A protein has these predicted regions:
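N-proximal helix/coil linker or "cap" segments that precede and/or mark the start of modular domains
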Residues: 4-34, 178-180
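Short, acidic, Ser/Thr-enriched surface-loop or helix-capping motifs
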Residues: 26, 39-40, 144-145
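Short loop/turn microsegments at loop-to-beta-strand junctions
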Residues: 32-33, 54, 138-140
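A short beta-strand-turn-helix
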Residues: 35-54
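Short active-site neighborhood of thiol/selenol oxidoreductases, capturing the structured segment around
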Residues: 48-69, 75
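Structural microenvironment flanking redox-active thiols in thiol-disulfide oxidoreductases
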Residues: 67-109, 117-121
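Thiol-/selenol-based redox modules, centered on thioredoxin-like
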Residues: 136-180
Length: 180
């Protein structure tokens, strides 16, 4: 078994078989935890940069793995629909900047892919899975309202259908004028 296959098995275990190892919790209606992280191009982004607009923050376990690629490409393919209703998208994982850059370039992802190597942001959002030296973010998404509140928290995400669910919710919330 090569090391990549072993890593994928460990990631699978952490995400499916060991959900109790997640640290923290963030609920709908709460103020979204702040962040300041570097993207795939070395630029810094903070939650406050997106103040006044809807923001989709999706966490994923590891760049350029099958589910994460499906999810990232789905957000890419629907980015104009998100922007059409006044929303932006950011992806966050514990991968280093260079891995985020390779992932973003390979799939032409048109939004910030943020590096949370320390796992601090994932921890504050309650999605960090810690297993010794290996930290991963659980695949979860937060829809943050223009006033910085968590309007929706998506758990048990299916990468094949998730983007459309988030977009449908965003369109309904935007149409209602309801920030939460």
């Amino acid at each position: 078994m090569n090391s990549y296959t072993h890593l994928l098995r460990v990631v699978f275990f952490l995400l499916v078989a060991a959900p109790g190892l997640v640290i923290g919790q963030t609920d709908e209606g709460q103020t979204a935890p702040d962040f300041r992280l570097q993207d795939q191009n070395g630029d810094w982004h903070a939650l406050s940069d997106f103040s006044g607009q809807w923001l989709v923050v999706y966490f994923y376990p590891r760049a350029d793995t099958p589910g994460c690629t499906t999810q990232g490409c789905s957000f890419r393919d629907n980015i104009y629909a998100f922007r059409g209703v006044g929303a932006d998208v950011v992806g966050i994982s514990t991968d280093p900047v260079d891995r985020q850059k390779a992932f973003s370039d390979k799939y032409s992802l048109p939004f910030p892919i943020l590096s949370d190597e320390s796992g601090d942001v994932a921890r504050r959002y309650g999605v960090l899975i810690e297993r010794g030296e290996m930290n991963f973010a659980r695949r979860e998404t937060f829809l943050i309202s223009p006033d910085g509140q968590i309007a929706r928290h998506y758990q048990n995400v299916n990468p094949d259908t998730h983007t459309q669910i988030v977009l449908d919710d965003l369109m309904a919330l935007s149409a209602d004028g309801d920030p939460s």
